[in-house]
């Protein structure tokens, strides 16, 4: 039996029995935190080295992590092309209005087309913010999301392999580590939350729900770097790197003191963290004022990068390029181009996505595509590579 089928069978069995477990336990690194039995963490230290572990005994259950909402499990996964990975210019976006994740085929773009015309694949996810496609040795091809319902979805079937509900912490970003463990960055919770999801490989569903929290103020972004073997994490005022310690379900994070970088003055409130798929030396970071490119070798931030003159805008929540050099960005927030009256839609979402690419006839071109019935937050190039 493949790990995907095993995970799906275990999750479905637990859902039928109403036994979606909460918690689980790794012992936190010495001096980094306290273990809490069977409950969510209620207090968090602002010290950047702190960690807290939530734990229950093997085989016991707790319903604090809610089961998947009926409206998401019963909705249909739409697949127009089950294997679009050969296509280059695909972009993922989460539509917070429709509560679904959508893949758009930008190679099908032509004058007069809207985003709706380019839709290739979708899956119902609930209200989510962070999203990534990963080709993982443990789970296979999957899409991971972070939000009111954070989950691992098999791709292209859309089948949920694992999920948890923790909306109060306001999850913003997610990363699936090579080990199969999952990290979720939560802004209100001010944490990086490391779930032991690799335990699903051993058939231990309860253990997979165990997590350890690591404090990071207003955590918004998280990204694994296979070249440097560190986990990058973005908060409101700084970018940090963590190394992984331990293996499998006992894996932990350790902050690297000499890899903490303060964001430039006046360029605070990090929103998005993504790789530069054309050069592993760099990362892209969005803040309220602009888009920054971070140099891993020098530790410097810059607003100058390829085509920055047309791409660098304010109030961009999501920004990503792909290996072919195309760029994708969510449209400006603040109600630009919309007639929304609900404040949340105009504050952090947009109805449009920028697609920037090299046109053989016209050179580098930027088009803005909209879907009037959508509300996008973060977007991401559909690429299974970490960088």
Describe each region flagged by the PLM:
Residues 92-97, 142-148, 184-188, 231-237, ...:
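Conserved beta-strand positions in repeat-built beta-propeller and related beta-rich domains
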Residues 126-137, 168-177, 216-223, 265-276, ...:
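Repeated scaffold domains used in trafficking and secretory/extracellular systems
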Residues 105-111, 196-204, 243-251, 295-303:
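Short loop/turn segments immediately following beta-strands, especially the blade-tip
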Residues 23-32:
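Bacterial lipoprotein signal-peptidase II cleavage site
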